Amino acid sequence: MSASELATSYAALILADEGIEITSDKLLSLTKAGNVEVEPIWATIFAKALEGKDLKELLLNIGSAGAASAPTAAGAGAAAPAEAAEEEKKEEAKEEEESDEDMGFGLFD
């Protein structure tokens, strides 16, 4: 993340903390006050992305979204050992077939 993106993010957090509506003009004025040069496009992008959203609520819900996806990951992980066991059985079967081919007669060795 570039310095201008980071500064714009911090400016949005400051505005949200104060309960002020997040607009591109306000983001630019905050970044200018912090002596950070930001292209106006970044302020516009951040303002449109956060328009009509409660930034504090979004930040509070970050942890709950991670907890909800954890059981899904655990379910997918449980399938992996079963697949590995099937692959091992197939490999063992192939090894047995190969060992049957070499009976040790060695007629033409």
Curated annotation (Swiss-Prot):
Name of the protein:
Large ribosomal subunit protein P1C
Q: What is its subcellular localisation? A: Cytoplasm
Give me the stretches of Acidic residues compositional bias.
94-103
One Pfam family matching this protein: Ribosomal_60s
Q: Does the keyword Ribosomal protein apply?
A: yes
Gene Ontology cellular component terms for the protein in this record: cytosol; cytosolic large ribosomal subunit
Species of the source: Schizosaccharomyces pombe (strain 972 / ATCC 24843)
Which keywords does UniProt give here? Answer: Cytoplasm, Phosphoprotein, Ribonucleoprotein, Ribosomal protein
Q: Name the job this protein performs.
A: Component of the ribosome, a large ribonucleoprotein complex responsible for the synthesis of proteins in the cell. The small ribosomal subunit (SSU) binds messenger RNAs (mRNAs) and translates the encoded message by selecting cognate aminoacyl-transfer RNA (tRNA) molecules. The large subunit (LSU) contains the ribosomal catalytic site termed the peptidyl transferase center (PTC), which catalyzes the formation of peptide bonds, thereby polymerizing the amino acids delivered by tRNAs into a polypeptide chain.
Q: What else is known?
A: Yeasts contain 4 individual small ribosomal A proteins (RPA) which can be classified into two couples of similar but not identical sequences. Each couple is distinctly related to one of the two A proteins present in multicellular organisms.
Give the record's GO biological process terms: cytoplasmic translation; cytoplasmic translational elongation
Q: Which ranges are annotated Low complexity under compositional bias? A: 68-83
Q: What's this protein's family per the entry?
A: Belongs to the eukaryotic ribosomal protein P1/P2 family.
Tell me, in one coarse class, where this protein mainly resides: cytoplasm
